[in-house]
């Protein structure tokens, strides 16, 4: 239901503005990409009455584009290589000398800077293939602020609401994202890219003007805006929406099969029934 709500809301907003609803297959993580799952996406969206331009953009076809932009950021010393595993990050951030419980950002526990301290930046003309690549947030956010037309304040326009009701012009500083987001991974060792980098480049390539997505991605938008500044790409208008939750207030997860659209459909539900369930106007 959560994905249905997001897709229906985006579709309704696009139609109201005379725009296009775009579908993109984000399949860079092969452990979560299956032909059967992709086919189910098409089936569900078509059943809901949604239409989109074809062929759809597929991220797995654009790996060379992501590598090219990573190379650009690497040469400009916005990236550093990192060999830390998730366990390494958790243990370092939870070490006794760190004091309080580790801070958590959009990608989980904030990276404590282990490999950054080694200053493993642009050494050699090619990207390292034996390590992840992290964004050096201090340098990146500082430069993004200088590039921005309003001085050192970085901003984007929000027409929905963040998790704490944030709306309108959302402004933030380099100091804020250094402390609350940190050095995020831009290229995983096993896939050569990341969600953050890929969606920024894909949105620009598709000419996306409005991004509609869940409020759980609100903080990640700050990462995306910084990348847009560094790569000289346009910043869309963002609309973050509420999350669909169960009767106990728990967010519905992808694995919550009990609320899969196919089951509602098999039980005789109509697309307008789904709209009513998620609180959207019927078509």
Residues covered by each model-derived region:
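Short, surface-exposed acidic
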Residues: 53-55, 235-238, 272-274
């Amino acid at each position: 239901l959560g994905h249905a709500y997001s897709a229906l809301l985006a579709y309704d907003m696009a139609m109201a503005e005379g725009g296009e609803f775009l579908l993109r297959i984000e399949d860079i993580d092969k452990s979560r990409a299956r032909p059967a799952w992709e086919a189910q996406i098409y089936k569900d969206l078509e059943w809901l009455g949604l239409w989109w331009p074809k062929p759809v953009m597929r991220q797995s076809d654009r790996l060379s584009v992501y590598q090219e932009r990573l190379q650009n950021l690497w040469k400009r010393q916005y990236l550093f290589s990192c060999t830390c595993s998730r366990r390494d990050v958790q243990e370092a951030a939870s070490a006794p000398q760190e004091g309080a419980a580790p801070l958590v950002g959009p990608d989980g526990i904030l990276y404590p800077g282990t490999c950054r301290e080694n200053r493993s930046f642009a050494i050699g003309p090619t990207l390292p293939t034996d390590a992840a690549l992290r964004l050096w947030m201090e340098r990146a956010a500082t430069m993004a602020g200088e590039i921005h037309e309003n001085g050192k304040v970085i901003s984007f326009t929000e027409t929905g609401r963040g998790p704490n009701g944030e709306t309108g012009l959302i402004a933030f500083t380099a100091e804020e994202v250094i402390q609350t987001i940190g050095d995020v991974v831009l290229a995983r060792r096993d896939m050569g890219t990341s969600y953050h980098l890929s969606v920024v480049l894909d949105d620009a390539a598709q000419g996306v003007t409005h991004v509609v997505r869940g409020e759980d991605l609100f903080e990640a938008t700050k990462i995306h805006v910084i990348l847009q500044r560094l790569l000289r790409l346009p910043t869309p208008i963002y609309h973050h929406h509420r999350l669909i939750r169960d009767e106990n207030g728990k967010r519905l997860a992808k694995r919550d099969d009990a609320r899969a659209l196919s089951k509602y459909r098999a039980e005789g539900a109509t697309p307008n029934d789904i709209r009513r369930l998620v609180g959207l106007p019927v078509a």
